[in-house]
Amino acid sequence: MAATAISSLSFPALGQSDKISNFASSRPLASAIRICTKFSRLSLNSRSTSKSLIHCMSNVTADVPPVSETKSKFLKAYKRPIPSIYNTVLQELIVQQHLMRYKKTYRYDPVFALGFVTVYDQLMEGYPSDQDRDAIFKAYIEALNEDPKQYRIDAQKMEEWARSQTSASLVDFSSKEGDIEAVLKDIAGRAGSKEGFSYSRFFAVGLFRLLELASATDPTVLDKLCASLNINKKSVDRDLDVYRNLLSKLVQAKELLKEYVEREKKKQGERAQSQKANETISKCLGDTLYNPSFLVERKS
């Protein structure tokens, strides 16, 4: 699979509408949800013991909350309605991430964080309100008893590092010193031992984001990076294909939603103009009928 950059998707900003949250399912939307369900079924059976220099923030406690509690925490933290095109996918993601989060083998991974942030930002691009989008992210991560700021911080560190790399230096991390290099070395060691690494589809997206930011367009770079990290390249290829398909379906679904919103706005505008015209006519007729001078016979 060519390691070409995932094209940057630009979903047009959608206007607010009371009916957005009840938008009927379309074929592209239904397909996007099915793909997202497949995408979000993470690898839950592998072990992970993170020793990365970037903060490892989450260890599983003895008391594992049920999925319903995680979903309830999310809904309590963010009480505003979420358009169904976003909400359906978010609900599926949070269920699957809950299952991964509370496995005994789960450890926080900065590359995973980069992948999740990338997927979330692509999914929520074009959301009617930037402030709400950030609030939803905060509520989502905190519902999993993790730190949303740390997700963003680690993702930003990984992105900044990748922008300063070339295809060659990205692959040759093992011969260099630095915080991110230490993270990648740790991943390679754990993945190589097959005892302390938990691969996930978000991890695959995180890897690809590194390639994208390093402008690594040579198809062999991803092969080399996976080999350096002791990651199964076939799994990465498969998961990135699913990710691309998901984004494509989301574009189609959001375009349909945009058209729906524009039609509703147009209808509302037409109704408002019609009502205003009727009010103007009624006012004119009222002024004429109830004007006393109208009842006075004019003299020729």
UniProtKB/Swiss-Prot annotation:
Residues 220-300 are cytoplasmic. The chain crosses the membrane at residues 197-219. One of its GO terms (biological process) is positive regulation of stomatal opening. Ubiquitous. Present at higher level in hypocotyls (at protein level). Ubiquitously expressed in all organs, in roots of both light-grown and dark-grown seedlings. Highly expressed in the root apical meristems. The keyword Isomerase does not apply. The keyword Cytoplasm does not apply. This is Protein THYLAKOID FORMATION 1, chloroplastic. It comes from Arabidopsis thaliana.
